[in-house]
Amino acid sequence: MNILLTNDDGWNSPLLPFTADYLREMGDLTIALPQDEQSWTGKAMTRFGRLQVEERELCGVTGYSINGRPADCVNLALHHLCSKLPDLIVSGINMGANLGVSFIVSSGTVGACMEGNIAGVPGIALSQCLQPETYREWTNEQHLPAATVDDLCRHQREFLDAALADLRA
């Protein structure tokens, strides 16, 4: 499986090494992240200015640091940086909850998945709400069960329908 990893918290997210290491075991991983934190940017993209890409490495995986928003990162990765179109986009793990309409439509984590969906690539937006001082402890103690990711991949439409039903309520 070809996987694209992005987030809205950038390269300094304490959850990034854990997420990258886990996904690397699931398949071929490409990482495309904003160079700086880009929370609350939704699916906004850079309209003016020039996007710059810097190659980086994390957990033995080639990655790209982009001076744009999460949706920019996904767009550039899908159309210019990935050697093959990914089978899945994983956005996150977001540092904070993305619950409720205002959070969902404002989340750069979710916006990155929306950008991928426009290109026909399914995405999973992951969030974890903890106190900042407990993130590093959490990454040492927890894991993301492969069965959970597999289940999300198999039942994409069901989860999307459930999320939209909640938004309409």
What is each stretch, according to the model?
Residues 104-111:
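Charged helix-capping and loop-helix junction motifs
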Residues 34-37, 94, 128-131:
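Short, ordered loop/turn segments at secondary-structure junctions
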Residues 73-103:
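N-terminal glycine-rich phosphate/adenylate-binding segment common to multiple enzyme folds
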Residues 30-32, 64, 90, 122-126:
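Hydrophobic/aromatic beta-strand patches that form the interior of the parallel beta-sheet core
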Residues 114-169:
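Glycine-rich, Lys/Arg-enriched anion-binding loops that position phosphate/diphosphate groups
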Residues 1-9:
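Nucleotide-activated donor-dependent transferases that construct or modify glycoconjugates
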Residues 9, 37, 69-70, 94-97:
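Short glycine-rich anion-binding loops that position phosphate/pyrophosphate groups of nucleotides
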Residues 3, 14-80, 84-85:
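A cross-family phosphate/adenosyl-ligand binding-site feature
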